[in-house]
Amino acid sequence: MLTQTTAIKALFIYPVKSLGAVSVSTLDFNSSGVVNDRRYMLVDSKNRMLTLRSHCQLAQFHLTQVVGGWQVSNQQGAGILIEDEASTDQLVDTEVWSTLIRTREKSRQVSQWFSEQLDEWVRLVEFDDLETRYCKVDQHQVPFSFADGFPLLVCNDRSLSQLSRAVDYPLAMARFRPNVVIDMPVDAEFKVSALNSDDGGQLLFIEPCVRCNVPAIDPLTGVFQKDLHPKLKAQLKRAGKVVFGMNACAIRCRQLSVGQVLAISEA
């Protein structure tokens, strides 16, 4: 039997899909989902989304929230501001893993900057004002933006420590790109159906997160570690799939905070 509660150890948002994480003390929710998470996305000349699978160097861009927007910087410290109020009239039809989405180019200047950094023509896009996207879970329709298939990813700190020992390599949680990091016994996250807050909010656990090659990319260098990849795959295999962490969605949540204690509902 699991312990009755767990604490939130860390929270992260990813303002631009596939770029570096931003550590936050609170995770806020509004009518569009997680505030500032995957709010923007890069697309190529064929309007296809850019991901870490094909562009490992995306992990090398860092984001900082400033007055009026997000400052994005490269490894050399050069950067540009993504202004909150910036907008263009250029509509871009794209998709996130087969889900068709109408977007709008955010800023031609920012698109040009990213194009120069990546040495290919790309555009930074955001949801068009009239566009919506929902994750259907039971009777709930949960809004979210450019996340892959589910609004949130929850990972277990102790499972990461065990994995590091198993592959004999110090692994940073940044490799797995969670929104919420909890503290539970190893692999206990797979036995949870929900985490419950005192104010009636819930994190519903949906299914284990199937993993590709991204965890083998060093988040500090952007280098794919070829020797580490098969070790991770071998250790993370469950029921024939390579998984780490749980996809989740938030129901009736207004805010989550680091240090917050949540009650556990077992699956």
Task: Show where each model-derived region lies.
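Metal-cofactor-dependent catalytic cores
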Residues: 1-267
